[in-house]
Amino acid sequence: MSQDLNEQPSAGEVRAFAYRLLGRREYSVRELDQRIRRKWPRLESAAVEDLLDALVAENLLSDERFTESYVRTLMQKLQGPLKIRAALRARGVSDALISLELERHAGQWADLATGWLQRQHTGPLDFDGRGKFYRRLLNRGFSHDQAMDALDSL
C-alpha cells in the first residue's frame, strides 16, 4: 500500500482496498466512491468510476443490497422510517429505491414504535409523559401518526 498521497496507487491496489471494504459490509456506490477518494485524493476520477462500474457489473457492489441491509439494521435499532430515509439519502441512495424498500416494511412501523415505547415505559402516562415520549418517538424517526398510534396503544 502506498502511504504517500502524491504517489498514484496501482489499479490492483485500489481494487484490493475496495474488496477489503466490501468484505466487511455492504456499501452504497457513493459511500465506496467517497472512501476511495478520501484514501487517494489525487486518483483520477475515471479510474474510480471504472472500478465502481466493474464492481457493480460483477454484482459485488449494489445499492439495492446496501439499502436492504441498512434498513434492516436500523429497524433492529428501532429507528423510524423518516430517520432511515434521511440516513440513506445522505449515503447517496436514490429516492425511488428508498421509497421501495421502506414501502416493503410499511406494516411494521407502528409495531416498532409501540415496541420501543413499551420497552421504555410501562403503565399509564400522564399528559407530560405522553408529550415526552411523543417527542422521543419523533426524534427516532417515526411520523406523527405512528407516534400517536403507539401512545394510544398503551
Q: What is each model feature region?
A:
Residues M1-L154:
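An alpha-helical, amphipathic repeat domain used for nucleic-acid recognition
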